[in-house]
Amino acid sequence: MSLLAYAAAALAEIAGCFAFWAWMRLGRSAWWTLPGLASLAAFAALLTLVDSPAAGRTFAAYGGVYVAASVLWLWLAEGQRPDRWDLAGSAVCLAGTALILLGRRG
């Protein structure tokens, strides 16, 4: 459930932020901000579904997922193929996510 929540949260956050990007940078209507705000609220709610007793650890692990999902958005939504640095950076961030999620505690 946690991986699905992270993926859904990333999609919601990126879509919400892109709505504001579209308004402020691409000249789209300010009406784009309404679904953007709803998407950002969904993002916050989705992170509460992650099975973790600590918000900070949840947010830190999510960061790597966000970076990788943003690079995927770059490619699929914006039509710009990621370069090797985008992919390498995403891999490093996902390795950090794995360390946070799978590291032994105690």
Swiss-Prot record:
Q: Could you tell me which SUPFAM superfamilies the record lists for this protein?
A: Multidrug resistance efflux transporter EmrE
Q: Where in the cell is it found?
A: Cell inner membrane
Pfam families on file: UPF0060 (PF02694)
* Entry GO terms, CC: plasma membrane
Task: Alphabetically list the UniProt keywords.
Answer: Cell inner membrane, Cell membrane, Membrane, Transmembrane, Transmembrane helix
Query: For this UniProt entry, which segments traverse the membrane?
Result: 3-23, 30-50, 59-79, 87-104
Question: HAMAP family, per this entry?
Answer: UPF0060
Q: Please give the family membership noted in the entry.
A: Belongs to the UPF0060 family.
- Tell me what this protein is called: UPF0060 membrane protein Mrad2831_0929
> Which source organism does the UniProt entry give?
Methylobacterium radiotolerans (strain ATCC 27329 / DSM 1819 / JCM 2831 / NBRC 15690 / NCIMB 10815 / 0-1)
